[in-house]
From Swiss-Prot:
AMP binds at K13. It is an enzyme of class 2 (transferase). It catalyses: (2R)-3-phosphoglycerate + ATP = (2R)-3-phospho-glyceroyl phosphate + ADP. Monomer. The keyword Transferase applies. It comes from the Eukaryota. The keyword Transferase applies. It comes from Pseudotsuga menziesii. Belongs to the phosphoglycerate kinase family. This is Phosphoglycerate kinase. Keywords: ATP-binding, Kinase, Nucleotide-binding, Transferase. GO terms for molecular function: ATP binding; phosphoglycerate kinase activity.
Amino acid sequence: FLKPSVAGFLLQKIGVIESLLEKFAVGTESIAK
């Protein structure tokens, strides 16, 4: 079973990746226009 600290760390990593993907998507949209 995962420790709470490990789960929190993974969730934080996922959040960072999602924000980077969102910024990348916005960037590609502005380029496509």
